[in-house]
Amino acid sequence: MTHPVADPSDQARASNFDLSVVISTHDRPEQLREAIDAVRAQTHPGPIEIIVVYDKAEPDLTLADDEPHRPVRVLTNDRTPGLPGSRNTGAAAATAPVLGFCDDDDLWMPTKVARQLELMAETGASTCVTHVVITVEGRSSGRGSTPVMRFEDLLRSRRIEGTMVAAIVDRHAFWTEIGPLYEDIPGGFAEDYEWMLRAARHADIAVVTETFVQVRWVVRSHFRLNWPDWEAALGLVLERNPEFADVPAGRARVEGQIAFAIAAQGRRRDGLRRAKRSLGSSWREPRAYLAAAVALGVPAPWVVRTLNKRGHGI
């Protein structure tokens, strides 16, 4: 497990930047350049440093640029392989007082940084997210919610804007009160959700109620069919957040996801038992019924692809 530690960049010189943006990447060169361009095109007048972190891939050093207003640094993940380690690598190299995170297949809209820094200054929040739009195979669906995201909200529902690519966070809080991303989560699955739960437990999260991130989903993702990791990761989320016991709808949701992962592994009887446990918390939980359907023979990949094409996940 990655524990909260002292900010590794505390001993660096005073930063000349308002924001450090960590872009994690793996073998998506064209999309990576688009993600970098979107950050460089931010309307925020102050300087922003961009830190590209390659994970399990050869870095393209030609992307580095020392332009003072929007410089680009290129690193390789020197921590645990995977997205959590990649993001922590970039955060450790950052010098600005505020961190932002972006993946190579996501795009920030031009006024994202300006609006979020403005809201953080107004509210004193240590973490701020924005609404997002999900694009799948050319079709887009918008998602959004209330101006504040509380811990109880995230226990109850996996809010789509509760994701690292929509967030900026005070760097000191990231390393201390909240803590960095846990690198021991199997397959790096649910690392965003687990971190957002910790951030919201620390303090309410401010929400910009406008859409400033385009999440470009790929229907076939490397972890979506890795059911054992999915099962184990969600089990850790429940274990590390005992407060789920007091939120039946939220516990039913996560139990339903675990049931689906179990059934998708071919462990049909265990999947049905876990689905029953989910329904015991809330009979309305749709994931429990999907898990039961898979346990009875409906192909799990077909269910996942069908949901993904509509901008939804399990």
Show which residues each predicted segment covers.
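A conserved acidic beta->alpha catalytic loop
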Residues: 38, 54-63, 79, 103
